[in-house]
A protein has these predicted regions:
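A solvent-exposed interaction/effector surface
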Residues: 1-172
Length: 172
């Protein structure tokens, strides 16, 4: 299998592009996080068999609104929820309300793993994460793909990290 989880120790130092900051996978690898009403701007992305058709336009639109509101979060977290082969919902993490944007809050418990490779490997990453959740004895509710950089920055940095967030039933 060519897809693998990110190696411990994080990426080698790189020169920032000025677009997306370099991503350190270590804080996201094999973690459990709980969100309580975490705020996101939501955009709907049209796809053709899971290939996004208007993602760049949607991200640009959302980022303009977020930057105008001065609510850009430090984490630069962008989650994708593949609703169907023809539509996904994109969630961009923000610090506060963004006028003119659809706002949502996400709450829950999530297990995370970091993967590196081309986006076409996403189905393999999701299968691996599903097995990982089961191996931990947890019940999977939903998967989100967390994009860490745009395609141009992934190419410039030589890595394409994706964090898979598995929403799980909380332990009782």
């Amino acid at each position: 299998m060519t897809t693998q989880t990110a190696q411990a120790g994080g990426p080698a130092p790189v020169t920032p592009t000025g677009c997306c900051p370099p991503f350190d996978p270590v804080p996201y690898e094999d973690q459990e996080v709980t969100w309580d009403h975490k705020r996101f701007v939501k955009e709907r992305v049209h796809s053709f068999f899971h290939v996004p058709l208007d993602m760049g336009r949607k991200v640009t639109h959302a980022m303009r609104l977020i930057e105008a509101a001065h609510e850009k979060a430090a984490h630069n977290l962008m989650l994708s929820d593949e609703r169907s082969p023809f539509r996904s919902d994109l969630y961009i993490d923000v610090d506060g309300p963004v006028p003119g944007a659809e706002m949502v809050e996400i709450s829950g418990t999530f297990l995370t793993r970091v993967y590196e490779g081309p986006f076409r490997d996403a189905p393999k990453w999701c299968e691996d994460m599903t097995r990982h959740v089961a191996a931990k004895g947890r019940t999977l509710k939903k998967l989100y793909l967390g994009y860490t950089t745009c395609p141009a920055c992934a190419k410039a940095y030589g890595t394409n990290y994706v964090v898979v967030f598995a929403e799980v039933e909380p332990l009782t």
